[in-house]
């Protein structure tokens, strides 16, 4: 189904935003509600479910934290995330140096964490049962952990040398955190340990640094501004401004050396790419200029390019229940990429026509022509 993703003229997302969209998140409980955050501080919540039961429908905005809201972010919202266990709470972080914990029902902040520098990224563990820590990457090289239970943000992970652009908890081990920095390094941490850092990933797998310490290891020859675990937590995918994407074995820290070719990445801040869940094989959806490049994760093959936005794509999010993709762009639009409906299989297909039914969909266009989109 992922191989047949396309813009669908019967599906639209209500246009609310007046500036570029930086971040999207779909709640994992029902897969129904989506948050978006934009570059002027506004947050919008959408209902993705088709309540009209008609083939053609628009995903409606249920509410927004707009410019007139007393607690709206003053500057660009860089990350939004639902509380993993239910839809009663969500989080947002911003260039206004805050992380806000929102009560969905009242649309009021239940808590606000303040930082000394710009906040690039934050993440809550999708599997944690023993802690309520939010990892936060800021302009400081220190990774900060905010505790929802105590309200404290005193726990700090030290080791990076420049700003931390991306953070992600492992979906396999609740105390393991991955961070990516402008220093070219990706670090894995066990937040229970006093020393913290488990390893610093080495793109050369030790070949060039056997005589030197682990401190010399780099994951990319540029800023690391995106990272994401596979859904099983066994691998970590990272992206850097060296125009490279790398796949790592998350338990050994080994670079798997999968070659994705040149992955253009000029973003000076975090890049929000997505990984599929429940597909075989699994795919990575990577913002690539005004398009989205779709790669098979374990072979590195570029399967297709999704075209539809008019400006730079900043983020995308995968909806696993229906294997749909949503993307946000500087053009102020959120686009829905829907698997093309399968052709009905007729009972009286002749044997001669069977080979045509088995064309590899990877070689078909995965977007609509402009006529179809009209």
What are these regions (language model features)?
Residues 21, 77, 222-226, 270-274:
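Signature of short aromatic-glycine-proline-rich micro-motifs recurring in repeat-based ectodomains
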Residues 37-40, 92-96, 136-140, 179-183, ...:
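Conserved strand-to-loop turn within each blade of WD40 beta-propeller repeats
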Residues 1-45, 49-52, 346-374:
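Intrinsically disordered terminal extensions that flank WD40 beta-propeller domains
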Residues 25-31, 81-87, 123-131, 150, ...:
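Loop/turn segments within WD40 beta-propeller blades
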Residues 1-2, 206-208, 255-272, 277-282, ...:
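Terminal intrinsically disordered, low-complexity extensions flanking WD-repeat/beta-propeller proteins
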Residues 93, 165, 169, 180-182, ...:
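Internal, well-ordered interaction modules that form the hydrophobic cores of assembly/scaffold domains
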Residues 223-250:
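Long, well-ordered mid-to-C-terminal structural blocks that present hydrophobic/aromatic surfaces
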Residues 2-9, 45-74, 85-87, 98-133, ...:
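Per-blade loop-tip surfaces of WD-repeat and WD-like beta-propellers in eukaryotic adaptors/scaffolds
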């Amino acid at each position: 189904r992922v191989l047949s993703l396309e813009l669908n003229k019967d599906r639209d997302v209500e246009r609310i935003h007046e500036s570029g969209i930086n971040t999207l998140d779909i709640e994992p409980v029902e897969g129904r509600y989506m948050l978006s955050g934009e570059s002027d501080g506004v947050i919008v919540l959408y209902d993705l479910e088709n309540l009209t039961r008609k083939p053609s429908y628009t995903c409606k905005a249920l509410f927004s934290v707009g410019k007139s809201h007393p607690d709206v972010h003053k500057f660009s919202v860089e990350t939004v995330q639902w509380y993993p266990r239910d839809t009663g709470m969500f989080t947002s972080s911003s260039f206004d140096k805050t992380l806000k914990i929102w009560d969905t029902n009242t649309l009021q902040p239940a808590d606000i964490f303040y930082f000394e520098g710009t906040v690039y990224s934050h993440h809550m563990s999708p599997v944690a049962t023993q802690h309520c820590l939010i990892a936060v990457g800021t302009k400081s090289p220190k990774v900060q952990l905010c505790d929802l239970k105590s309200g404290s943000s005193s726990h700090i992970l030290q080791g990076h040398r420049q700003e931390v652009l991306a953070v992600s908890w492992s979906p396999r081990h609740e105390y393991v955190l991955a961070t990516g920095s402008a220093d070219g390094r990706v670090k894995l941490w066990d937040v229970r340990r006093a020393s913290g850092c488990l390893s610093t990933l080495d793109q050369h797998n030790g070949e060039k640094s056997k005589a030197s310490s682990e401190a010399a290891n780099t994951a990319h020859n540029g800023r690391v501004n995106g990272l994401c675990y596979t859904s099983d937590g066994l691998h970590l995918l990272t992206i850097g401004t060296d125009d490279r994407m790398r796949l790592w074995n998350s338990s050994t820290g080994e670079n798997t050396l999968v070659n994705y070719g040149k992955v253009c990445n000029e973003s000076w801040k975090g890049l929000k790419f997505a990984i599929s869940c429940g597909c075989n094989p699994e795919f990575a959806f990577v913002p690539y200029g005004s398009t989205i490049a779709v790669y098979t994760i374990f072979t590195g093959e570029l399967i297709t390019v999704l075209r539809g936005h008019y400006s730079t794509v900043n983020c995308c999010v995968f909806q696993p229940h229906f294997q749909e993709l949503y993307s946000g762009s500087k053009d102020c639009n959120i686009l829905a990429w829907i698997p093309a409906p399968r052709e009905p299989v007729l009972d009286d297909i002749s044997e001669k026509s069977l080979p045509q039914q088995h064309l590899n969909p990877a070689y078909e266009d995965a977007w609509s022509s402009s006529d179809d989109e009209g």
